[in-house]
Amino acid sequence: MGVFAFEDEHPSAVAQAKLFKALTKDSDDIIPKVIEQIQSVEIVEGNGGPGTVKKITASHGGHTSYVLHKIDAIDEASFEYNYSIVGGTGLDESLEKITFESKLLSGPDGGSIGKIKVKFHTKGDVLSDAVREEAKARGTGLFKAVEGYVLANPNY
């Protein structure tokens, strides 16, 4: 089993608190609205706090799959949200899980900066570039889609 990591960051015009709320507390409602492939987000275990497991169902080219998203930690005071993708038909077969440690920092002009550390826990000793790049693209797409929703809905 190997562990492969990368870090990324994304600037946003949206303030920390507002974007954090959209990316965490309200994400179950927002994400299916802004990402066409996501059909549903449902809690299958827990109450929304650490330990909660969500089933995220998506459709890609007529094929439906799902991932299990486990909340590892939420800290509203420091704008930190840690979670893992721990299973499901949408998790690449080469992976045991993917862990995410995210934090929103104060950014320029009232905005924020999203920082994320991603660790791929592989079943073998290799992580393909395709798997890593696809996960990175999906993460960036999700962040930008939720940010776009908040910017388009000023009364959010």
From Swiss-Prot:
Trans-zeatin 2 binds at residues 28, 54. Coiled coil: none annotated. Pfam families: Bet_v_1. It is found in: Cytoplasm, Cytosol. InterPro entries: Bet_v_I/MLP, Bet_v_I_allergen, Plant_def-hormone_signal, START-like_dom_sf. Its EC number is 3.1.27.-. Gene3D superfamilies: 3.30.530.20. Optimum pH is 6-8. Transmembrane segments: none annotated. It is an enzyme of class 3 (hydrolase). Keywords: Allergen, Calcium, Cytoplasm, Hydrolase, Metal-binding, Nuclease, Pathogenesis-related protein, Plant defense. This is Protein LlR18B. It comes from Lupinus luteus. The gene is LLR18B.
